């Protein structure tokens, strides 16, 4: 797959999100299994790994630092701060002193002296974005981070932040099921020369077509609290993804690979970071690199699952308060 630019470096646009190995969903692999998966990810040609202070209260960063420390020059490393796990809940804090402290802690956990891209994980409503970005700019000047990113923001906030310091990347949720960045953000990123990094490009497993029984997931799994996975909405959403699977099979691929290929085709500045704790699922995701879709196929896929056909909101009311992305 042709490389794309990210914070001044040329990387494979199909990266790897390292949340799933410690955070958010069901059971998690042992450290040894997670370490083998991380090395397999690099062996498969991925050279962009994304993590965060939040994930497992720093455990994701620790695993990357422990199991990839001898391969640090083989991959582009992105992490995030300004959102941490406190007593089991996410706490947003964009104060400059917090950002500086969390960058230093991330460097220690990751066993590195530089993080290629560091995001403000969530916008703090109590702190002007200019102050948070100013702190990140100081970290760039100090050589601790290579570029500044923002996550789950609007185009308006991106423009404000970019006036303080060039923003290398924006990371928002984006997939066939979640199209909010199409309102303004993807285009604004392109205009500013900012990469757009899509997290949850398989919409938390939904777009694989393999996630059938939500009720059977552990009670701590975050999908229990998301409206699209509710007992009222999910049966209808399964009908949509089953149609996607039929299309994928007819075109010689899988629903997962087709969904990822669709996302990558939405712009030359777009990167995706699907995550998994499963080796077979990772290999399936890598299949997106060989999926070639013409304009008619892209349109057909996009018309099948979108903001008008998917049932339910992306987040519940509490979760929605933590993001600033535009709404349809």
Describe every region a protein language model picked out.
Residues 1-75, 328:
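N-terminal binding-site loop/beta-alpha segment at the start of enzyme catalytic domains
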Residues 16, 49, 64, 77, ...:
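Conserved, mostly hydrophobic/aromatic
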Residues 9-14, 45-48, 72-75, 112-116, ...:
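Short, well-ordered coil/turn segments that N-cap beta-strands
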Residues 25-26, 86-180, 184, 194-195:
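Glycine/proline-rich, positively charged
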Residues 181-218, 254:
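Aromatic-lined glycan-binding groove of carbohydrate-active enzymes
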């Amino acid at each position: 797959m042709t490389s794309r630019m990210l914070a001044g470096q040329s990387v494979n646009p199909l990266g790897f999100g390292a949340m799933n190995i410690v955070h958010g969903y069901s059971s998690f692999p042992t450290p040894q299994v997670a370490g083998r998966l991380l090395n397999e990810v690099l062996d498969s040609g991925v050279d962009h790994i994304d993590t965060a202070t939040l994930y497992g209260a720093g455990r994701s960063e620790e695993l990357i630092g422990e199991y990839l420390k001898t391969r640090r020059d083989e991959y582009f490393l992105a992490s995030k701060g300004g959102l941490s796990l406190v007593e089991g809940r996410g706490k947003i804090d964009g104060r400059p002193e917090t950002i500086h402290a969390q960058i230093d802690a991330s460097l220690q956990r990751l066993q590195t002296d530089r993080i290629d891209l560091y995001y403000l994980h969530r916008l703090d409503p109590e702190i002007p974005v200019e102050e948070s970005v100013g702190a990140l700019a100081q970290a760039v000047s100090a050589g601790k981070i290579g570029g500044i990113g923002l996550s789950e923001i609007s185009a308006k906030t991106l423009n404000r932040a970019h006036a303080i310091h060039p923003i290398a990347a924006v990371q928002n949720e984006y997939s066939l099921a979640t199209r909010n960045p199409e309102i303004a953000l993807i285009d604004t990123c392109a205009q500013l020369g900012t990469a757009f990094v899509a997290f949850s490009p398989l919409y938390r497993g939904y777009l694989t077509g393999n996630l059938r029984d939500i009720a059977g997931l552990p009670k701590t799994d975050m999908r229990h609290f998301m409206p699209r996975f509710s007992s009222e909405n999910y049966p209808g959403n399964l009908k949509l993804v089953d149609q996607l699977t039929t299309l994928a099979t007819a075109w010689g691929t899988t629903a997962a690979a087709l969904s990822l290929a669709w996302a990558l085709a939405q712009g030359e500045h777009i990167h995706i970071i699907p995550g998994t704790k499963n080796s077979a699922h990772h290999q399936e995701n890598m299949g997106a690199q060989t999926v070639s879709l013409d304009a008619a196929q892209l349109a057909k896929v996009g018309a099948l699952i979108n903001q008008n056909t998917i049932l339910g909101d992306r987040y519940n009311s509490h979760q929605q308060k933590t993001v600033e992305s535009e709404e349809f």
